[in-house]
Regions:
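FAD-binding FR-type
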Residues: 1-11, 23-30, 45, 71-73, ...
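Catalytic cysteine-centered active loop of the rhodanese-like fold, especially the PTP/DSP P-loop
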Residues: 10-13, 105
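Fold-independent oxyanion-binding glycine-rich loops
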Residues: 14-15, 43
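Hydrophobic/small residue at the entry helix of a nucleotide-binding pocket
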Residues: 16-21, 111
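Internal, well-ordered alpha-helical scaffold/interface segments
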Residues: 19-26, 53-56
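Reductase modules of NAD(P)H-dependent flavoproteins
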Residues: 36-151
Length: 151
């Protein structure tokens, strides 16, 4: 569930990190949240965007929602003309100053540990950063320098 705020919201989902973000977005749409929202969804290949049609539908139906899929390992078979590279770097290219935003990050430990400090360095307030890292069985939760922890 989103905090009660007027700040624009940036979601960064790495691969299956889309699942918890999907839940938050569906709740926001149901409650009629009108704040600007962007979803940066990073995957390796085009076929990994497993519910792309749903996210595209949201972008058509909700003028305050914007979708930015990002492929990190695009191949010729992907026939991809969209954004490429690391998902958090794509977001930072579009939003170089994160002050006045809320950011929700969901994905692998490695992605969260790379993204959160980069976002804080770009002006994101500690109390406006929320993350949920997917830990392999037997692994440990990440310890980024800042952020609120679990979404």
């Amino acid at each position: 569930t989103l905090r009660d705020s007027e700040m624009p919201i940036l979601f960064v989902a790495g691969a299956t990190g889309f699942a918890p973000v999907k839940s938050i977005l569906e709740d926001a749409f149901h409650r009629g949240v009108r704040r600007p929202m962007w979803l940066y969804w990073g995957v390796r290949h085009r076929h990994d965007l497993y519910l792309l049609e749903l996210a595209q539908h949201w972008a058509r139906e909700h003028p305050n929602f914007h979708l930015v899929p990002v492929l990190s390992h695009a191949s010729p078979e992907d026939a991809w003309s969209g954004r490429a590279g690391l998902v958090h770097e794509a977001m930072l290219a579009d939003f170089p100053d994160l002050s006045g935003h809320e950011v929700y990050v969901c994905g692998s430990v490695k992605m969260v540990e790379a993204a959160v400090p980069a976002f804080i360095a770009r002006g994101l307030a500690d109390d406006a950063c929320f993350f949920d890292a997917f830990v392999p069985s037997g692994g440990k939760q990440p310890e980024p320098d800042a952020g609120q922890g679990r979404v």
